Amino acid sequence: MTRAVCLLSGGLDSPTVLAYALSNGYEVFPLSFDYGQRHKKELESSKKICDYYHLNLKIIKIDLRAIGHSALTDNIDVPENDLKSIGNDIPVTYVPARNTIFLSIAAAYAETLNANEIFIGANAIDYSGYPDCRPEYFNKMEEALSLGTSIGLRNGIKINVPLQYLTKSDIVKLGRKLKVPYKLTWSCYNGRKKACGKCDSCLLRLKGFMEAGDFDDIEYEDYPEFYKTYLKNKHFDKF
């Protein structure tokens, strides 16, 4: 059985990737980061997801608040946007070099497991415009890790990005097929009791469920107008 490290954030995408890797016969080692993010509830979700799949979650603590310069790690407000404005520019929720840091640590962890594959739930279609979610980034990062690690020199490092060219609705459909427990997930950038329904992450998540003809059954403080209209038209009982 091929071993692989899977980066797990507890949101919509990474649990789908985890389920995908398991369904393809990998021995998966989930890895999450406590990096000083305001939405620490995602770590609770990661733990619940790993409990669901009977997997041991490794959490590594790194304090990216020391770097700051992001609405997720600094005293910067999380913006409330609309769907049309998402992806037009690099948003303030971008954490500087986060995927580079995470993938580097994942590669180090993989070396200790004698594993040379990493799974990550990045997406380059319905996303916020982060530079470290682009296909060309992952290609170059794969090259760098293959050159800069012991196991990479022997076998190469492979970064698997199975959701890279999928829309959010495609991801939801795949997740339903794989029976991902989306009720346990958390995508919101705000660390409140309920998802805000207004940040980029909430909007893209709800857009995905809407376009998949599905219903997102986590709790929200409020729904955006496009999702309210969708629920009314679909006659969902929960609305």
Swiss-Prot record:
Manner of cofactor binding, per the entry note: Binds 1 zinc ion per subunit.
A Pfam family of the record is QueC
Gene3D superfamilies referenced in this protein's UniProt entry, alphabetically: HUPs (3.40.50.620)
Cofactor entry: Zn(2+)
Q: Any transmembrane segments, and where?
A: none
Chain positions recorded as ATP binding sites: L8, S9, G10, G11, L12, D13, S14, P15, T16, V17, L18
Which InterPro entries does the entry link to?
QueC, Rossmann-like_a/b/a_fold
UniProt-listed Enzyme Commission number(s): 6.3.4.20
Report keywords, A-Z. ATP-binding, Ligase, Metal-binding, Nucleotide-binding, Zinc
According to UniProt, this protein's pathway is: Purine metabolism; 7-cyano-7-deazaguanine biosynthesis
According to the UniProt entry, the coiled-coil residues are: none
Which of the seven top EC classes does this enzyme belong to?
Answer: ligase
Protein residues bound to Zn(2+): C188, C196, C199, C202
Q: Which GO terms describe its molecular function?
A: ATP binding; ligase activity, forming carbon-nitrogen bonds; zinc ion binding
| NCBIfam families per the UniProt record, alphabetical | 7-cyano-7-deazaguanine synthase QueC
Would you identify the family this protein belongs to, as annotated? Belongs to the QueC family.
Q: What does this protein do?
A: Catalyzes the ATP-dependent conversion of 7-carboxy-7-deazaguanine (CDG) to 7-cyano-7-deazaguanine (preQ(0)).
Protein name in the entry = 7-cyano-7-deazaguanine synthase
- Lineage, highest ranks first: Archaea, Methanobacteriati, Thermoplasmatota, Thermoplasmata, Thermoplasmatales
